[in-house]
């Protein structure tokens, strides 16, 4: 599968990785999950002046849109794994599992948030108990 080959560079889906990392580190507050599982990006967007480089949201959506639809989920899985490894190396033990859960939770919905055609939700195996899709 060429998708797996594609996720070798640390550069790959860089904005996605940044976003996943940012979400993982947030315990509450910020644009994480609202109750119905939709994102609340509005706050994020308003802080960005028009003169700044495109907000992270736009960057990672561009990255995903450049992937082949077939590769979107495998590549996101790769990105999630990379972020997970970063967190496991650097953060203190406490709360780590929760962060990892948040990475996968966030990644699962990125295609939908970015309106990727043909992909809405990536069926990652959840690390938490509950249905695995």
Curated annotation (Swiss-Prot):
Residues 31-49, 131-133 form a propeptide. One of its GO terms (molecular function) is nutrient reservoir activity. Keywords: Disulfide bond, Seed storage protein, Storage protein. Cotyledons and the axis. It comes from the Eukaryota. Coiled coil: none annotated. Signal peptide: none annotated. SUPFAM superfamilies: Bifunctional inhibitor/lipid-transfer protein/seed storage 2S albumin. Belongs to the 2S seed storage albumins family. The small, basic, water-soluble napins are one of the two major kinds of storage proteins synthesized in the seed during its maturation. The mature protein consists of a small and a large chain linked by disulfide bonds. This is Napin-1. It comes from Brassica napus (Rape). The lineage of its organism: Eukaryota, Viridiplantae, Streptophyta, Embryophyta, Tracheophyta.
């Amino acid at each position: 599968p060429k998708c797996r080959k594609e996720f070798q560079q640390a550069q790959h889906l860089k904005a996605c990785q940044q976003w996943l990392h940012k979400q993982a580190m947030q315990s509450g507050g910020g644009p994480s999950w609202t109750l119905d599982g939709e994102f609340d990006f509005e706050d994020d967007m308003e802080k960005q002046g028009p003169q700044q480089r495109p907000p992270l949201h736009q960057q990672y959506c561009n990255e995903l849109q450049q992937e082949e639809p077939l590769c979107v989920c495998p590549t996101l899985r790769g990105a999630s794994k990379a972020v997970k490894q970063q967190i496991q190396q650097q953060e203190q033990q406490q709360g780590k599992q929760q962060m990892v859960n948040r990475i996968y939770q966030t990644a699962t919905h990125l295609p939908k948030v970015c309106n990727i055609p043909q992909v809405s939700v990536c069926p990652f195996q959840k690390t938490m108990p509950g249905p695995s899709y």
